[in-house]
UniProtKB/Swiss-Prot annotation:
This is Large ribosomal subunit protein bL35. Residues 1-15, 27-40 have a biased composition (Basic residues). GO terms for biological process: translation. The lineage of its organism: Bacteria, Pseudomonadati, Pseudomonadota, Alphaproteobacteria, Hyphomicrobiales. PROSITE patterns: RIBOSOMAL_L35.
């Protein structure tokens, strides 16, 4: 049986760390930033670690070879 392919959209959005955690960018930075404070905008920079259950689902269904 052949290996499962990784979903190409997930490949661009998520990164699996060496310890198996799943990292992703913060949501909510595409538009509507005028309503947010400078602190809120600043806190949305960079990446975040997903909750364990969400990360496990991402790895199982979208990143099977990670």
């Amino acid at each position: 049986m052949p290996k499962l392919k990784t979903k190409s959209g997930a490949k661009k959005r998520f990164k699996v760390t060496g310890t198996g955690k799943v990292m992703s960018a913060h949501a909510g930075k595409r538009h509507g930033m005028i309503k947010r404070t400078k602190k809120q905008i600043r806190q949305l920079r960079g990446t975040r670690v997903l909750f364990k259950t969400d990360g496990d689902n991402i790895k199982q269904y979208f990143l099977p070879n990670a």
